[in-house]
């Protein structure tokens, strides 16, 4: 996906990028590739692939959710900033918090935020399990997202405690979303959520399947969740 295709594809979805925003994406690409040489941020470094599989894919959540109605967003395990930084570029009013367990990725994100001149972005070097137990962070975000490879049952335990009541947890998944939703049903309910929508679509050009699972927070998450680091992954809430 070259820049013209990227711009046109977003235009079709009602997102018009200014010259400043296009420049931010260019800088993002440049910094990603530079920093990737000293640390492992991504295996995707070819420009057209980055624009499709990282930038466009990250922004796809906004095709189904109105981000103009969202103010605070928390991204769990964002790695090199996906999906929240591309969303922040498109929707500059967002207040973005990223939590990642690797200090070197946080170092990159801090430099990236400076390079892109982003306001209202905060990065925490922490495990999602311990971050989710911080009193001032629990139930405090309009929207929590993850584009991670962990199963939905695991992601729900890491993300739902941070979502405010009536807020959303949005999981960006590749294929196999139906099986994950089935296995994750119990976790979603126990943690106070309810699956309200699932959107399936194909990425343009390469036509690989993508799914966006939208979970609404209906009631408070019990205090014991998330459990201690490593536990959600070792023994997910499934049954």
Swiss-Prot record:
Query: CDD domains of this UniProt entry?
Result: AdoMet_MTases
Q: Where in the cell is it found?
A: Cytoplasm
Q: Which InterPro entries match?
A: rRNA_ssu_MeTfrase_G, SAM-dependent_MTases_sf
Q: What is its EC number?
A: 2.1.1.-
Question: Whose protein is this, by species?
Answer: Bacillus pumilus (strain SAFR-032)
Describe the task this protein carries out.
Specifically methylates the N7 position of guanine in position 535 of 16S rRNA.
| Matches recorded under SUPFAM superfamilies | S-adenosyl-L-methionine-dependent methyltransferases
List S-S links within the chain: none
Q: Where is this region: Disordered?
A: 216-239
- The lineage's top-level taxon is Bacteria
Top-tier EC class? transferase
Indicate which residues the UniProt annotation says bind S-adenosyl-L-methionine: 77, 82, 128-129, 147
Task: Please give the family membership noted in the entry.
Answer: Belongs to the methyltransferase superfamily. RNA methyltransferase RsmG family.
Q: Name one GO cellular component term.
A: cytosol
Q: Which region is the signal sequence?
A: none
Q: Which UniProt keywords apply?
A: Cytoplasm, Methyltransferase, rRNA processing, S-adenosyl-L-methionine, Transferase
This entry's Gene Ontology molecular function terms read:
rRNA (guanine-N7-)-methyltransferase activity
The protein, known as: Ribosomal RNA small subunit methyltransferase G
Among the Pfam families in the record, one is: GidB
């Amino acid at each position: 996906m070259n820049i013209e295709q990227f711009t046109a594809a977003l235009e079709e979805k009602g997102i018009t990028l200014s010259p400043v925003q296009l420049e931010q994406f260019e800088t993002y690409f440049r910094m990603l590739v530079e920093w990737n040489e000293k640390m492992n941020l991504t295996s995707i470094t070819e420009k057209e692939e980055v624009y499709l599989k990282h930038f466009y894919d990250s922004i796809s959540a906004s095709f189904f959710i109105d981000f103009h109605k969202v103010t605070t967003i928390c991204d769990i395990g964002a790695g090199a900033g996906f999906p929240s930084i591309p969303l922040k570029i498109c929707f500059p009013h967002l207040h973005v918090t990223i939590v990642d367990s690797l200090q070197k990725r946080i170092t990159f994100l801090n430099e990236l935020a400076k390079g892109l001149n982003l306001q209202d972005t905060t990065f925490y070097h922490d495990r999602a399990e311990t971050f989710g137990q911080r009193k001032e962070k629990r139930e405090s975000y309009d929207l929590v997202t993850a584009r991670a490879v962990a199963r939905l049952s695991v992601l729900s335990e890491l993300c739902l405690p941070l979502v405010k009541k009536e807020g959303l947890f949005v999981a960006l998944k590749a294929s196999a979303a139906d099986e994950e939703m089935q296995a994750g049903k119990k976790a979603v309910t126990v943690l106070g959520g309810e699956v309200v929508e699932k959107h399936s679509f194909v990425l343009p050009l390469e036509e690989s399947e993508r799914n966006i699972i939208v979970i609404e927070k209906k009631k408070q998450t019990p205090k014991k969740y998330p459990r201690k680091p490593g536990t959600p992954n070792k023994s997910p809430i499934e049954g």
